[in-house]
């Protein structure tokens, strides 16, 4: 099935105003009663190794389901695994990644649960091992599993140890040569027993691991505040600020680099996205409400020449509040950001979903951030409910080809579940 979409196309990695086609490739029908299959913090939902693309989702029975295809093919091989997930909790998503030898790694079903992890029995296989420990350390209370692939084929794995408002960031590393995990940090970012970091991260083309986060002091989303930053140039062992100043670990509220000051009760969302420009400068996408406004807007926080800057995109008109606990039904998605070019002349694409645009897959494009002029277009002519954008990071890094995971899902406020029929999971191939 194909849908016509509007997109500001990529040409030689620069944006230009043009129309293009998006090809929507159906995969399989899946659970859609909440947003567990379509939350922004799935790292990853889609991933490509050489010419094989993998996908993961929960089916209507709550089974961890895997799929693969050859790139540009329309037929998927789908396998329902023996593993289950609590599909009634939108936190309990699936994350996948493929290591440098082609083994698929999977982690799923966490919201203060013992770590669930397995990997494929052979390269490019959809058959998984039994459930395995990673390191056996700090694996009893895990949330938000995320994989990141390093240029040498090794993997980094992040998760929260603890609960909302009182948790620590754990970092593990997988070595493809030894095929073993080691724990690099039990407490990379220390909440000091009174708050925790809600992070987003990325790896640039040189292998620098960038991480940014907001602090939260309670389960109430309204307690989110500030945007902080750290990076590692040695595979996650040592950490520094954007200036090169070394961190004394663990990072905490007192020594963390402040990228942007954002007060509590600003409708600041947690767990969004970040990327880097062609020079490795970090770009962080989020949304919050400025002090003189009632309307939360998308913002870009970025660093150029050792100076932090912030852009208010300003195109939204509808107010809303994030106060409360649990996964909420929110009129906009958390954003996904991609950048080309360098510094103040970089071009940005921000992918999102907004009820103001009938909940379609949309993109805001700025060709020159020094001018801060944005053009907003819809990529689909169909709505996607409470979907949030995730994409195939490795395909983008390797081939600058953009594939989005898309499913029309519903989310009831306060961790509720909708009476929804299964919906088709699609890969939206942006040409």
Q: What function would you assign to each model-found segment?
A:
Residues 1-22:
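Bacterial Sec-dependent N-terminal signal peptides
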Residues 21-431:
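Extracellular, repeat-based ectodomains that mediate carbohydrate processing or recognition
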